[in-house]
Amino acid sequence: MEFQKILVPVVGSEADAEAIKLAVKLAKKEKGKIWSVYVVTIKRALPLDAEIKPEIEKAEAILDHMEILAEEEDYEVETDILHAREVGPAIIDEAVERGVDLILMGVKHKRRFGQFSLGNVVPYVLKNSPCPVILHQQ
């Protein structure tokens, strides 16, 4: 498959680093574009444009790290911080707005009493994505 536009949502886990490296490999083949986004969740009591400094600083550090990882592979990644009430819908909205061909997400292996759990965001993205989704397990 050929992917010209790849969206890589990140949360700051080790799986994100592997996901960005995989995105670079996929994008290099077609000289595609990669966007890495971090979604800052805004509580309903606050306006959507509220500045939550610690969360913004965390997002900037994570996205800077993604840029460095891509540069190590001689590739450029555009980064963006999104403000939203919920992460899943923000990722889908971004994918639609940018017209991406692929959403690539790094997921941590979580076990709960012997069962595999993907949390809330990944199932939402899988169900509502306008394009293929690749999950890269750490």
Task: Indicate residue ranges for each PLM-predicted region.
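Active-site phosphate/pyrophosphate- and oxyanion-stabilizing loops and adjacent acidic/basic residues
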Residues: 24, 92, 123
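Small/aliphatic-rich secondary-structure junction motif
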Residues: 1-50, 69-73, 78
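Short secondary-structure boundary segments
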Residues: 38, 106-108, 137-138
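Glycine-rich, Arg-bearing micro-motifs that act as flexible, cationic patches
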Residues: 105-127
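A short acidic, glycine-rich active-site loop
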Residues: 51-61
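Structural beta-alpha unit
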Residues: 1, 71-103
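Short, acidic/small-residue loops that bind anionic groups at enzyme active sites
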Residues: 124, 128-137
